[in-house]
Amino acid sequence: MKKVATLGEILMRLATPNKERILQAKNFDADYGGGEYNVAVSLSQFGVPTKFITALPDNAVGDAALYRIRGFGIDTTSILRQGDRLGLYFLEHGAAMRASKVVYDRAKSSISDIKTNTVDWQKAFSDIDWFHFTGITPALSKSAAEVTLEATKAAKEMGITVSADMNYRKNLWSPQDAQATMKPLMEYVDIAIGNEEDAEKCLGVSAENQDVTSGELNPDAYRDVLNKLSDNFGFKKIGITLRESISASDNNWSAIYSDNGNIYVGNKYSIHMVDRVGGG
């Protein structure tokens, strides 16, 4: 079975209990999360061999995160122990019409301070068939962006399949900064994943007559987006998620997919969510 490596940040997740607001909370439930870490965990639970590449502080907090990663059967042999701190995020679960709220405390985290030429990519990728990254890691810092590019180039040179979830985060960077960084990375990507906002903010590609902030989804409009992405960046496969928010706990979800120019529209599913964060 193919082995997948992901590169990114693991954060300690501090969630309010019983859907309390952050301002009400007297204590928080601690766990761990992160876009690329979540992918590694999910794949591992499906029986896919995985490796997670990150940087953790060399202290008890970093040890706790490392043990958590290992607990899911994920290969941790390429994790660096460096830097001063593990990033945090505070989570306020949504209720009814009140959306979930996330507050980040991740500045100067270990992964943000990672430098090029510190990971031996030939060794890290020696048993890897697929490399996955997201737009979150290069948004953390200039050096994290440089390491992401370094990893992506190495994977491509080694004949490894490369996938990218664009995952635009407005709290981390502007569309202008995102495009300046993400467009060069796309040269090495075989498979792209995202939604309509990701395509517009990260790559400057938008659906005709579609407002990405309206919440109204028109699958036909995204055929043009898929064609533009294929033409401009040469992706072999592209997946765009289509999500309609009904409430904090109920969404309609579908997807549109391009496989070498052949476009497929998925069925729409009504989903009652147990935990929205990390659900894509």
Region annotations inferred by a language model:
Residues 1-21:
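Positively charged, low-complexity intrinsically disordered leader regions
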Residues 172-261:
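Conserved phosphate/ATP/ADP-binding segment of small-molecule kinases
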Residues 154-161, 233-236:
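A short helix->loop->beta-strand "cap" motif at the edges of active sites that frequently abuts
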Residues 29-32, 247, 269-280:
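Short glycine/threonine-rich catalytic loop with a Thr-x-Gly-x-Asp
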Residues 52, 162-164, 192:
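Hydrophobic faces of well-ordered beta-strands that scaffold small-molecule active sites
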Residues 13-16, 38-45:
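Beta-barrel outer-membrane channel/assembly domains of diderm bacteria
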Residues 49-136:
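Conserved N-terminal subdomain of the carbohydrate kinase-like
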